[in-house]
Each structure stands twice: as C-alpha cells, then as structure tokens.
Amino acid sequence: MTKKNTLLLIDGYGFVFRAYYAQQPLTSPKGEPVGALYGFTSMLLKLLNDFKPKHAAVVFDSGGKNFRHEIYPEYKANRPPPPEDLIAQLPLVRDVARNLNFPILEKNGFEADDIIATFAAKTASIGEEVVVISSDKDLLQLMNDNVKIYDPLKAKYITEDNVVEKFGVTSDKLREVMALIGDKSDNIPGVPSIGPKTASSLITQFGTVENIFNSLEQVSSIKQRETLQNSKEAALISWQLIGLDYNVDMDFKLDALEWSPPDHNKLTEFLHEYGFKSLYKRAENLFDIKISEHKEVIEEKAVEIKDISNKAELEAFAEKAKKVGIFGIYILQNKGANIAFILSLKNQAYIIKISNEANNLFTYNSKADNEWFTDIIFNLLTDQSIKKITYSLKPLLKFYASRAQQITAIEDLELMNYALSAGLPQKNLFEAVEKEATIEEAAKIVVGFIDLYQQTILELKDNKAFRIYKEIDLPVCFVIDKMEKAGIKVDANYLNQLSSEFGAEILKLEEEIFVLSGMKFNIGSPKQLGEILFEKMQLPFGKTSAKANSYSTGADILEKLSEQGYPIADLLLRWRQLTKLKNTYTDSLPKQIDNITRRIHTTFLQTSTTTGRLSSQEPNLQNVPIRSGEGNKIRQAFVAEQGYKLISADYSQIELRILSHIADIKALKQAFINKDDIHTQTACQIFNLQKEELTSEHRRKAKAINFGIIYGISAFGLAKQLNVSNTEAAEYIKKYFAEYKGVQEYMEATKSFAQANGYVTDFFGRKCFVPLINDKRLKQFAERAAINAPIQGTNADIIKIAMTLLDREIEKRKLKTRLVLQIHDELLFEAPIDEIETIMPIIKQIMENSTNMDVPIITEIRAGNNWMEIH
C-alpha cells in the first residue's frame, strides 16, 4: 500500500507489449485477438490490489515523430513493426484503462517517458511521493528521495544499489553512462566498443560526457581516446536523445489524477465483451462487487453435439484432435458411477455412452461393451504431442486403473482453479448436470474447456501460481490416485473383537449411568440427557440453547461437572468416547473393506481445504485417534500384507520449523540448528527453570504453548487447555513472545496483510484466502486462520512435493514399496521385508531435502507390522 497522496504513474505501452509477449494467444467471444488486452487488464488489477493508490494515471505514447527525431532522424528506425494481432489490439488498450477508471495521460509529439518525467517532477516538487511502474531503464534517471521506480517484471522496487550494480554509477549519472553505451533497441548510437564497465569508469573519473571531451588528453587508453574523439558527435547526440523532458506542456493538478473504483456496470460489460471470465473473481474481491453471470458465450454459438457409437467415428475424432493438438475430455458420473465420456473440440462435443453397472475402482473398463473406445482414447491420453484438458482428473485415472500413470500432457481445470483460490468456495462446473445426469448440458460445458484453460493458465501466471499448480498440485494428483488404489489392509477379525470389547464396556457404562440417574433413557439424546442431568438430578451448569430449546450437554459442560466431582459426568464422557470409536471405526471399517482387494480404499480430497492440505473421506483415515489407549488399539488393526512391513515417516515439529523460517525467529532457528529439544527450551524459559529441574508436566505444557501459539491461541483457550487461570496463561504467552522475538510481529503483520488483501501466502506463494477476515462477528476465528494458513499451507506443500519425488524414485528403482496413506505430517508406506533396508534411507533423505529452509527438516522413520507399533 502506498502513502496517502502517492501518485502511481504507469508506463502503459510498456505493460501492453510485455503482456503480449508473456501471454499465450487468446481470442474474445467474437474471435478477435485479446491476449495483450487480457494481460494488461490483469496487470492493472494487480497494481490496484498491491498499491491501493489514491492517485494514479496510465501514460501512453501518442505515436508518430517527436523532438528526438528532429535531433536524430534515425531514432528508433531499426524497430520492426509490431505483430499484426498486437496492432489490432493497440487502439483498445485505452478502453482497458478507462474501464478500470484510470486517468490517461498522453500528448502528441511526446513519448510516455517525458510525460512521466514531467508529472513525476511536478508531484515531487510539492513534496508528494511518486511511484513509477515500469521496466524501462531510461526511467531510472528519475530516481530520487520522492520518486521511486517499481519494476513489475521483477515485482520489486529498484534501489540505488541495484542501479550501481548494473551500471556502475548512481541514478543521477545514468544519463551520462547510457549516452556512451547507446541503446540498440532505440537506435541510439553511443560510442562504439564502450560498454557499461568502461562507461562507468569514465563517468566516475570525469563526471559527465561533456567533461570527458573537455579533458580527452586525460583518458589514459590511447585506443579509447581515439574512439571517443571519432565519436564525439554521436555521444553528444546520444546524450540529448537519452535525456528526459521534464517540461512537457500539460496541465498538472494532482487532484485530477485521483483514482476511484470503476463503474460496476461498465466494468462488468467490458469483462463480458472480451470474455475475461477468469478475471471476474479478482475484480469482485478487489472492488467488493458481484459480476452477474452472462449466459455462456459458448452456448450462444452453434454447438454441435454428436454421439459416437463405433470405432470408425472415434478414430475420425482422434485424427481431428491430432491435427489441432488439443481437446477436452470429461467423464460424466451419476452417484459415483460413470455414464459417459465427453470429448470436445472448438464448438463440437462428442458423447460416448459407458456401459458400466458396477461402481468399483477395479472394474470400470472390464465390460466388453466398452472395449471398442477405451484403447483409442487411451492412445490420445498418452500422446505427448496432444494437450488434454479435463475437469477433475481422478475419475479419468480411476477409469484406466493400472494404466493411468502413462497418461501425459493433461491439464486439470479444477486443480488450476484451486491453485488460484484456495479458501474461496470452489464452484463445481458440473454440479447441476451431475444431479440430473444431463449429458447434453454437460457436453456444452466441456466444449468450453479449451477457452477456459487458455484464460486460466494466463491467470495462474499473472498470480504467480503456475508453479504451485504444475509442480505441486498436478503431479501429486497421480500419486494420490496410486495411493487410493493401493489402499491399506485392516484386520477385520481383530476389529470385530475390539468392537465386542467396546460394546461390553458400553453396556456396563449404561447400567451405571441408569443407576446414578435413577431411570433408563436414551443416553444418545441430548434433550433427554439434559432433562435427566439438570431437571431430575438438579446438577449445576444447566443452560438451555435458544435454538434447540434444550439443555447444552456438550463436552465442556460434562467436563465442568466432572471437575465438581459428579461421577455420572465421567461415565458419560467415557460412554461418548467408546460409542464414537465403535460406530466410526470398529463397526464401520470392516464394512468398507473392498471385496476384490480385501483392503480399505479411502478417497483423498485435493481441493477441499483452505491451505492445500489433503483431506480423507469414506472412510476418513486421517482422524484415527492417537492420544488414547483405545485409539492405539484401533491403529493396531492397520497391518501389512504377509511378507511386508509398514513404514511410518513423520516430519518432526515441522510447523514450528516452518514458523522459524517464514517469520525469521532467530532463537527458534538456532534451537533447531543446534538440535535442541524445542519443548524443553520453551519450558525452561516459560517456567524459569534449569533443564534438570523440569518435569514431564512442564514439557507437556511447553508443547501445548508452542503449538497453541501457531494456531493463534488466546489466553482463555490456553488456560482451558492447560487447566490454569487466564492470568497465568496470558503470562505464558507474554513470556513466549519475549523469548521468541519476531513471532508476535509476524502474527500482527500477517493479520494486517490478510485484512488488506483478503488472503495470505505460504512459503511457495500459494494464496490461502481468508474471506471472513473483515467480518466483525468472525474476526477472531479468521485471524487465527490467517496466522496459521502460511504455516499449514507450507507444511502441506512440502509433504506433497516429497510424495511426488518419492514416487518417482520408487518407480525409477522399480521397487515394490508403495505409499498407502498420507496423514498430514506423516506418510505411511507398505514395503516388502527385503526392501526395508533400501527404502527407509531413501524416504528419509527425500523427505528431509525436498525443500530448502534455514533450519533442518527432520523425519522420524520406523518400520513394523502394524500402525500402532510404528507410531
């Protein structure tokens, strides 16, 4: 964000040309080229978001000749004309600026550089600050205390040190050096054979070009002296050409350049007209508006939808796809079962009905009715020269079962959108048609895949999210698919036995509860339980919920009753714990064992969290309890196949290590570098004790403080967790911030950034949106989420990178070891016993070195027969 009256001066055509060459070709709904316009619009939106200026202007060249051509007719004579598709867009660039409500500055006979110089000088003369947005080196001459240069290509302010490093002189001497060097792009001659090093040396010695020629005899090199003597006129002309005109005759009123948000309707119409749908969300977030959905442009065109029912028709499509080099593909599902393949080219959709009654991972293409099309499509999917665009890649990978890993050159629109907007509602393109299983309507959406891909890939690059998508999210999707197909073995007999044990104890607990309450009732009914506790038994803490019109019987109430010595509360808490474990795990897991593989195959969701974390469902194997004896008994049910062992590789204190790096907490960094026990160190500082004086309770509390701080815990929350007073908890937090200087500053800076931008970023640049950050009712929750998101997001991306690298290494070595589960910080492998000694060091080395940070990343790794043994 800029200072109050800062003027932002934007080099218009500099942006437009950069946008054109940086973007892939893009056409509007009318078929006109708009790639440069899209890039220019995206760049201006980014500037508004990053700088939030009060005053701003986009400055354009007027075209034609100017005073420099009078000095030197060959000025810019060598420049080739712009490409034809760019020329067609140039008259429209001012519309982009106008629709974003930017004032425009231009004047016949003057270049944008001179107008920028004039307005920068006049603004600085009244004591206000100027930020020039340009990558043009000529404008570096303007740098001073009041005029800053921001290079959008490098996304940073240019400093005097940067200028000295590149040109050997400070900005006030840049004109002199550049006059000697010349500029081929503008056909400015300079002095032959004099480069930056020689030029800076001469200017350092003589001060100006004029002084060099006034003191030529003092130039020590005879060859340089002769060259200079022969090029005096060229050097002096170059000096005039490179200099900026600070006195362009234009009215200057800073107030006239005040920027205000654009007209909602005009902006909406503009974005619709040019088909910039991928910019809607950014415009909505930036200007706090809602852009209404126009009817899809693709539906307005004549969309041809054909059924493909035989091999010859599909082969004809394949030939077309090979010629154009790109096509859309989607598997339409209804209640999890595949019902159609939909293929698309521009304005054409092709439907192949799938004969598949069974809804099973391993029987998707087993029916003879499907054989005629599966191989032809597979050949297209594995052709590196043809790009495939899909939405939700995993059903396609499931369809091709063991052959899925050969699929290449494929892009996933769902993952692309997630890389742009984690934390915002993820719109399912096919939600409506999947409910109704309307194949024709789905086909119309698939027809738009190619255009949507071309727009979204540009937005990924504009938002610096391309690497996140291409190097993290897309490759790990293939690894997740393999992991889901591998599944994990569970001992069903053991779970049934455990379920019986839990059931017996539950019955015993129920009898004791009924005795204490004096009657039988439905313990699982909060309403009945509340009436028993607070009406019949007259226990304290009874409060009714206005919405439910019943007593609150949550864990917090039962824990309060337990602290007051009411034995029924302990029995109820234990009953709830056991019934949840029985219902969720010991009863449920055996029912979810696949009939073919005899293993459990969970589904990992890749786009459901704010931070990039994976989540698990059907069943959720990431929430298997760990901190209780019963939880460990359940983990004992997860076993290795005969002749195999399970390997657990778990990142140690990864979130604290990430915090130390991204917040630059020197005390934390040093502790990790020294391999100190961080919880012991924290305990010593918080409780003012020596290491030998600490108890396990001190360390437990320190651990809770360390990890609680990461999640933005309040004094109240910490007090409850540690069972201490609010005052004591507040003192712990105060001491923590004093010991680990920088943590509190990081938290405040992160909250401020989130409030200003609506998102935070992780170590890799992933944007984690926090849409509720400015909602007064949910502000504290959103602030805690904002503080933790960069840490949790970095953690998630580190382990996803490691998963991909490990998968590649296992494939390269042709090992039988396979990844079977990901549980946030932990990876669980199943390995043949004879591969254990080989694979364990590989896993540890790759996990610890997948990302470079200022502190070591440590992995704890163990092998055993079941999950409990190794955790």
UniProtKB/Swiss-Prot annotation:
Catalytic activity reported: DNA(n) + a 2'-deoxyribonucleoside 5'-triphosphate = DNA(n+1) + diphosphate
A Pfam family of this chain: 5_3_exonuc_N
GO MF terms, alphabetically ordered: 5'-3' exonuclease activity; DNA binding; DNA-directed DNA polymerase activity
Segments forming a coiled coil: none
Domain spans labelled 5'-3' exonuclease: 1-283
Domain of life: Bacteria
PROSITE patterns on file: DNA_POLYMERASE_A
Annotated Gene3D superfamilies: 3.30.70.370, 5' to 3' exonuclease, C-terminal subdomain (1.10.150.20), 5'-nuclease (3.40.50.1010), Ribonuclease H-like superfamily/Ribonuclease H (3.30.420.10), Taq DNA Polymerase, Chain T, domain 4 (1.20.1060.10)
Keywords: DNA damage, DNA repair, DNA replication, DNA-binding, DNA-directed DNA polymerase, Exonuclease, Hydrolase, Nuclease, Nucleotidyltransferase, Transferase
EC id: 2.7.7.7
InterPro entries: 5-3_exonucl_a-hlix_arch_N, 5-3_exonuclease, 5-3_exonuclease_C_sf, DNA-dir_DNA_pol_A_CS, DNA-dir_DNA_pol_A_palm_dom, DNA/RNA_pol_sf, DNA_polI_H3TH, DNA_polymerase_1
One GO process term, biological-process aspect: DNA-templated DNA replication
Membership in a protein family: Belongs to the DNA polymerase type-A family.
Subunit structure comment from the entry: Single-chain monomer with multiple functions.
NCBIfam families referenced in this protein's UniProt entry, alphabetically: pola, PRK05755.1
Task performed by this protein: In addition to polymerase activity, this DNA polymerase exhibits 5'-3' exonuclease activity.
Name the UniProt record assigns to this protein: DNA polymerase I
Source organism per UniProt: Rickettsia bellii (strain RML369-C)
